[in-house]
Structures are given as C-alpha cells and as structure tokens.
Swiss-Prot record:
Keyword Cytoplasm applies: yes
Entry membrane topology: Peripheral membrane protein
An MF annotation (GO) of this entry: actin filament binding
InterPro entries: Alpha-catenin/vinculin-like_sf (IPR036723), Alpha_catenin (IPR001033), Vinculin/catenin (IPR006077), Vinculin_CS (IPR000633)
Swiss-Prot/TrEMBL keywords: Cell adhesion, Cell junction, Cell membrane, Cell projection, Cytoplasm, Cytoskeleton, Developmental protein, Differentiation, Membrane, Nucleus
Tissue: Mainly in the nervous system (at protein level).
Region span, Disordered: 866-892
Known role: May function as a linker between cadherin adhesion receptors and the cytoskeleton to regulate cell-cell adhesion and differentiation in the nervous system.
The protein's name: Catenin alpha-2
C-alpha cells in the first residue's frame, strides 16, 4: 500500500502489448480487419488472369492509410492533453506516423503488383509493425487513463490520512466532508474503468472494492468519532484501526483491478468449486477406464486412495456437532459398505474385461452402480450440510441483540460472557458456510460464499469491540451510534452470507430438511407441554416459527425466478396459507399454553388444540414442499426419494407421528413399490388401465357441468384427483411416498365423500319422485361402502422377504385391492352425479322454481367454446333438426344427459 506521500507507481510494463480494456479492442478492430483483408488479397495462390494493377488492393490500401491518419490525429490530441506519460505518448505517435508511411509505400507497391511475393512479404512486415505501433499507442493512452484514476486514488488516500489525524470532533467533521467529496469523484472514475475492463475477474474485483469502500466509509466517521470522544477505551482504537485498514484495502483493490494486475493470494483461495465436490467429480471421471489398457497394479491403488480421501472428508462432516444421528449413520453406512463395495465390484469387473475392446454388460452395470453410489453419497452429504444450515442460520440476530442489551446496561462482565457466545455463533456461521462450499459445484457461488464468510470472520471482533465501548460508556450517544453502525453492518453481512449460501444449496434439500426439523421440534414441543417445561416449550416454538419464516421467505424468493402461472400460484397459495392462517393460530396456541403453564396455579387448557395447531404447521410446510415438487422430473423426484421422515427417538403418546413402519434400507414405500417384479407390474398396469376407463367416464360426466355453484361436481373432481394419486403410488410414481401419505389421502376421500353424501341427501330430500330418490340414496350407500374399503386398502405396502440373502419384493394383492376399491368408488361417484342431476330436474318440474327455496346445487351446462355467430349448415341437417323438434317427443332426463357430448375444450 502506498503512503500518502509516495509517488504514483504504475504496476504495468509500458512495453507490454496486452490489451486490457474493451475500448482499445474496439478501436483496434477495424484497422486489424482492413490490414488483414489487404494482406489476404492475393493469398489464394497464382492467378491465371492477366497480371496488372488491382483496383481492390488500391482501395484497401487507401482505407488503411485513412485509418492510420485518424489514429495519428487522436494520438496527437491525447499526447497534448495528457499530464502523465507525455513523452511516451509523443514517441508512440511518431512511431505510428513512421510505420504508417512505411505501410503506405509497401501497400501501394503491392497494389501495383499483387502477384509479387517479395512485395507481399514486405507489406506483411510493414503491416505487423504498424499494428504493433498503433496497439502500443492505444495501450499508452489507456495507461494514461489509469494514471488519472491512480491520481484520484492518491487524493483519496491523502484525505483518508487527514481524517485519521483529526484532533477533535469538529476537525473530524470538516475533514470527513472533504473525504466524502473525493470519494464521490473516485467512485465515478472507478465505475467508468470497471465498464471498460476486458477481464470479467478484474471487473468483479473492481465492483467488490468499490462496494467495500462505500460500506466502510459509513463506519469510518462513527468509529473515528468514538475514538476521539473516548480515547481511554481501548476498544475504540481497535474499531477505528479496523475501519481504516478496510478502506485502505479497498483503495488498493481499486488500484489493482484498474491495472488488471494479478489477484492477491487471498482472493485466489476463494476460487474453485468445493474440495469434496471436486474430489467426487474427479473420482467419477477416473472410474471410466479402457479395458484394453486396464492394469490392476496401476489403477487399483489410485482409485482406492481417491475414495478413501473422499470417505475421510465425509467422515469429518458426519462427526460434526449439528449432523443428526440418523444422518451420521447413513453417511457411515454409505461409506463403509455401499461405496467401498461398489468400487471393489467395479475393479473385479475391469479385471474380468482386461484386454477386451468393448465393455461387457456386467462392467457397464458395475460402472452405473458405482456412479449411483457416489451420487447417493453426495445426497447424504448435501442433507447433512442442510442440517447444519437449517440450525445455524436460524434466528441469526439473537446472539447480537443479547450482546447489545448487555452492553446498554453497562455490565462489562456480562458483555464478555455474551461476546463469547456471539463469537461462537459467528464461527459456526463461517464453518457451516465453508461446509456448504465443500460439496457445491457452483464455482461463482462458492466464491461469493467464501468472500462473505471472510467478511463475517473479520467483522465479528469489531462488533464485540463496539459492544465493549458501549458497555464502558453506556450513556454516551457516540458509543451508541457506533454500536448501531456496526450492528447494521453485521446484519447486512449476515444477510449477504445467508443469501449466498442459499444460492449454492438446493431448494428441494432445504424443504426436505426443514420439514423433518419442524416435525422434530413439534414433537419436542408436545413433550415439553406434557412435562410442563415452559422454557423448552417457548424456545422450541420460537425455533418452529423461525424455520417456517425461513421456508416462506426462501420459497417466495424462489418463485420470483419463474414465470407467473398455475405452478407459482399453487406454491404461493400454500405459503400464504402457512403465513397468514397456520402460523398465527400456532402462535396463539403457544401463548395460551405458556400463560397456562406459567400461572402460579397451573390453569387447565385444551392440549389437543395445541397439538392440532402444531400439526398444521408441519402439514403446511409439507404442502409447500409438495407444491414445489410438482414440476420436478421423475429423476429429480427419485433423487429425493431416500429422504423420508426421520425416525426420531423422542416420542410421546400424543406426539405427531408420520413415520412408516415398512421403510427398509432408507427407502420409501413408493420406492419399494417401484421395485416390484415385472410380472406384478404388468398386472398392476392392467388394473390401472381399467381404473382409467372408469376415470374417463367421470371426466366426461363432470366436464358437462359448470362447477361454480355446484359443490357436488367440485367434490367429484377432488376425489378423482386423489384416487389418481393413490393408483400412481401402486406403480411407484406420483406425489405420495409412504403408506402414511396413502392413508391420509384415503381420509381426504372419505371426508369428501361425507360432504358429497350430505349434499346429495339434501337433493334427495327435496326430490318428490320416490324412484329417483331411492336410486340416489342407494348410490350414496355405495360411496360410503367403497370409501370404507378404500380406507382399509390404503394401508397398501410391498412385502419384503429375505430369501437366500436376496430381498424379494412383492405387493400385487394389496396394490390390486387398492385399485379395485378406487375403481368401484369412481363408478359410484359417476352414478351419484347423474342421479343428483335427475333428482334436481324432477324437483324443478313438479314444484317450479318460483315456489320453492333455492336449489341445493346449481346444475348449469358449461359454456361452450366461442364460435362464429353464423355457421354454414347442410340443408338436410337443418331440415332434420326442424322435423325432430316438431315431433315434440318426451325425452327422459337420463336419456338427455347420456346423449349430451362434452366438447374437448370444456
């Protein structure tokens, strides 16, 4: 770093012809094009045409001469105006003039005799010399611009030194005002230079340095003022020196970026993808070998060493404090058994295929298995990291607020105790951020996270110093202002780090972990409620609120990346329900519970109300996750399939239970159903096809009606959709993962069936036709029966048997029973819809619409697609319709309904 009195040093070799700005490149490009075109005029070999003068070559030579003249005029002007590098610029202009004259003569002679190789060679050498001279002139002009920027930097450095040497607060105010003016000028010049820089890395460095300068300038005044007001408090000097150092480093950053010099070693450490991610990527590449050249002695030690290095990194992550026990077990199992065994199997297959030209099927299968196991390990590691992120980036401002409150009270001992907590919190943020980087392939995102983490690491001690200053002088407004500035800076930096970490992690992983953590916290709340532990209840409920708020914030931000449509509407509807309905109810129940438990004489309250409110929070987050996953591909859903509900040890008789007892090897019930034998899958597919035929009947029926004002149609559609999800589950597809999901779906169908029963019975009660009424009631009995059957069959699960050490999966009977029950229910719903309509028509026909109460539901045909007002029709069709109308034949409602054809667009 140059001092305020040192001369300006340009870290740039004047003899270098490296182009560093877009402007030089743009100015040079036309001349390069013209010279290249001229040189290549006769580059196609000897011509059979008569030798003579080339008109094209003369035109090109004239254009080169004119372009050179333009450069000379601009060069003369720059040399006259420039205060820096004046001698070098004048010399460069003369060199361009000299080389331009040489080029003019050589190009003219070449144009007169374009077939002469000697003259062409002379012109090529002259062209190269001219381009070098012009390039050097432009680069010197560019260097002159950099010198002007460095002059501004020197002025700012001097103003900064003046601020540092201020002797009183008034002197500080005056000097800081001057510093601010010079800062504005510097920012303008630096911004222009940033736009001109050719290297994206240098542009990023310039932007970062400008941002750091602006950010620290805010703290510069309050830190200096606090030092002048309380020089006896050591923490004030530490604050001031830190800010001055940050400003000086920002100025140095602008200088380096402007000259496009190499980044510092510190910045080099920020580049590149995560270490563990890079190791896994390299391992995946190294396992693809040529059997012809495979040598066990050469490749086995190398691959085993690489894998052990990966396993060591995974073990460190597994042993970290925030990693859940079950996650740790999964990672260890994945490393010790699955991945190592897959590598040994792969090496064995390579040995069997040694010397062959083509890879055999067993070898390809072994490669796929190895790749799948490393992919599974990646997922487990991402999930472990997300455990840390979910816990550490929750209520990030609490340690800071506690520290500030202690400082305001003037209790220095307490401040030192809370400072240790704050320091541990900051260290945890940095540690978790680095963990997130270690498994990320997002190079740019990793760089941002590491830079933000570095800022957090350096800012943490200064926040503590500001708190110590306030604790020593709690009545001082200057100390309070200084604390506020550092507080604001800390909160901004934490937000930057949080957003950067969110950018390199998966939303799907975040939602999966958040769902499991909220379930864990809900169960803790229930246990605390039963044990009367108010502190644990309050703290855990706060964690639930924080997790839910994070989910809402992240998903709302994620939806901004999508075009507005049905998908985003569904997701935002789920987040809105959680934020505006579910969370207020949960907060209310927590308050009621805490008040009741905190009373001198514990007051009775409805425990089930609290449990229901807690369950709704979990369901709300789960619904958001389901909505987000709606557009995922089957492969992406498969990647998420092994992240099921956690098997927590903490349980109580009233805690929220959502786990499945049939999970094996960390797989979901849906994933197990997908592993059924092909014969059973084929039979299930036949049953599903029959179900789809029944579904098409219901689709045709409900498509006829406008569902506004007709809840029977709405309920029929809902039941149809849920039944489709249940049948998809039997094929190992769809949004339902576990038996608990299928059971919940069956409950929803039963609820919808009960509501349909209530509505249809109201229709039947108003129907005067006893036959229609009896038919409708009979169909309703079928719905009740089939809903009950579906509830029983919803406990579908694949049976897993261990025969000879091999897992045999079967589940045909339970799957076909579920599909059959769904088909029967679908048929009953179709008949109920038809019978409800018929009963409604009988009712209106006998009593008339004016003499009765409003109908239970409104049966209106869906409006047809818009068509031309005048339609050309064949005469015979027109006559036929008139004759049919004139017969006045009575048509029963059922017949009319069956003849009605819904259009595809309905």
């Amino acid at each position: 770093m140059t001092s305020a009195t040192s001369p300006i040093i340009l870290k740039w070799d004047p003899k270098s012809l490296e182009i560093r700005t877009l402007t030089v490149e743009r100015l040079l490009e036309p001349l390069v094009t013209q010279v290249t075109t001229l040189v290549n005029t006769s580059n196609k070999g000897p011509s059979g045409k008569k030798k003579g003068r080339s008109k094209k070559a003369h035109v090109l030579a004239a254009s080169v001469e004119q372009a050179t003249q333009n450069f000379l005029e601009k060069g003369d002007q720059i040399a006259k105006e420039s205060q820096d590098l004046k001698e070098e610029l004048v010399a460069a202009v003369e060199d361009v003039r000299k080389q331009g004259e040489t080029m003019r003569i050589a190009s003219s002679e070449f144009a007169d005799d374009p077939c002469s190789s000697v003259k062409r060679g002379t012109m090529v050498r002259a062209a190269r010399a001219l381009l070098s001279a012009v390039t050097r002139l432009l680069i010197l002009a560019d260097m002159a611009d950099v010198m002007r920027l460095l002059s501004h930097l020197k002025i700012v450095e001097e103003a900064l030194e003046a601020v540092k040497n201020a002797t009183n607060e008034q002197d500080l105010a005056n000097r800081f005002k001057e510093f601010g003016k010079e800062m504005v000028k510097l920012n303008y010049v630096a911004a222009r230079r940033q736009q001109e820089l050719k290297d994206p890395h240098c542009r990023d460095e310039m932007a970062a340095a400008r941002g750091a300068l602006k950010k620290n300038a805010t703290m510069l005044y309050t830190a200096s003022q606090a030092f002048l007001r309380h020089p006896d408090v050591a923490a004030t000097r530490a604050n001031r020196d830190y800010v001055f150092k940050q400003v000086q480093e920002a100025i140095a950053g602008i200088s380096n970026a402007a000259q496009a010099t190499s980044p510092t070693d510190e910045n080099k450490g920020h580049t590149g993808i995560g270490e563990l991610a890079a190791a896994l990527n390299e391992f995946d590449n190294k396992i693809i070998l040529d059997p012809m050249t495979f040598s066990e002695a050469r490749f086995r030690p190398s691959l085993e060493e690489r894998l052990e290095s990966i396993i060591s990194g995974a073990a460190l992550m597994a042993d970290s404090s925030c990693t859940r026990d079950d996650r740790r077990k999964r990672i260890v199992a994945e490393c010790k058994r699955a991945v190592r065994q897959a590598l040994q199997d792969l090496l064995s297959e390579y040995m069997n295929n040694t010397g062959r030209k083509e890879k055999g099927d067993p070898l390809n299968i072994a490669i796929d298995k190895m790749t799948k196991k490393t992919r599974d390990l990646r997922r487990q590691l991402r999930k472990a990291v997300m455990d840390h992120i979910s816990d550490s980036f929750l209520e990030t401002n609490v340690p800071l607020l506690v520290l500030i409150e202690a400082a305001k009270s003037g209790n220095e001992k307490e401040v030192k105790e809370y400072a240790q907590v704050f320091r541990e919190h900051a260290n945890k943020l940095v540690e978790v951020a680095n963990l997130a980087c270690s498994i990320s392939n997002n190079e740019e995102g990793v760089k941002l996270v590491r830079m933000a983490a570095t800022q957090i690491d350096s800012l943490c001690p200064q926040v503590i110093n500001a708190a110590l200053t306030l604790a020593a002088r709690p009545q001082s407004k200057v100390a309070q202002d200084n604390m506020d500035v550092f507080k604001d800076q800390w909160e901004k930096q934490v937000r930057v780090l949080t957003e950067a970490v969110d950018d390199i992690t998966s939303v799907d992983d975040f939602l999966s972990v958040s769902e499991n953590h909220i379930l864990e916290d809900v169960n803790k709340c229930v246990i605390a409620l039963q044990e009367g532990d108010v502190d644990t209840l309050d703290r855990t409920a706060g964690a639930i609120r924080g997790r839910a708020a994070r989910v809402i914030h992240i998903i709302n931000a994620e939806m901004e990346n999508y075009e507005t449509g049905v998908y985003t509407e569904k997701v935002l509807e789920a987040t809105k329900l959680l934020s505006e309905t579910v969370m207020p109810r949960f907060a209310e129940q927590v308050e009621v519970a805490i008040e009741a438990l905190s009373a001198n004489v514990p007051q009775p309250f409805e425990e089930n109300e609290f449990i229901d409110a807690s369950r709704l929070v979990y369901d709300g987050v789960r619904d958001i996750r389901k909505a987000v996953l709606m557009i995922r591909t089957p492969e992406e859903l498969e990647d998420d399939s092994d992240f099921e509900q956690e098997d927590y040890d903490v349980r109580s008789r009233t805690s929220v239970q959502t786990e499945d007892d049939q999970l094996i090897a960390g797989q979901s019930a849906r994933a197990i159903m997908a592993q059924l034998p092909q014969e059973e899958k084929a039979k299930i597919a036949e049953q599903v096809e029959i179900f789809h035929q029944e579904k098409s009947k219901l689709d045709a029926e409900v498509a006829k009606w406008d569902d506004s004002g007709n809840d029977i149609i709405v309920l029929a559609k809902q039941m149809c959709m849920i039944m489709m999800e249940m049948t998809d589950f039997t094929r190992g597809k769809g949004p339902l993962k576990n038996t608990s999901d299928v059971i919940n779906a069956a409950k929803k169908i039963a609820e919808a069936g009960s509501r349909m029963d209530k509505l249809a019975r109201a229709v039947a009660d108003q129907c005067p036709d006893s036959a229609c009424k009896q038919d409708l009631l009979a169909y309703l009995q079928r719905i009740a029966l089939y809903c009950h059957q579906l509830n029983i069959c919803s406990k579908v699960k694949a049976e897993v048997q261990n025969l000879g050490g091999e897992l045999i999966v079967s589940g045909l009977d339970s799957a076909t029973s579920l599909i059959q029950a769904a088909k029967n229910l679908m048929n009953a719903v179709v008949l109920t819809v038809k019978a409800s309509y018929v009963a409604s028509t009988k009712y209106q026909k006998v009593y008339g619409t004016a003499a009765v109460n409003s109908p239970v539901v409104s049966w209106k045909m869906k409006a047809p697609e818009k068509k031309p007002l005048v339609k050309r029709e064949k005469p015979e069709e027109y006559q036929t319709r008139v004759r049919r109308g004139s017969q006045k034949k009575h048509i029963s409602p059922v017949q009319a309904l069956s003849e009605f054809k819904a259009m595809d667009s309905f």
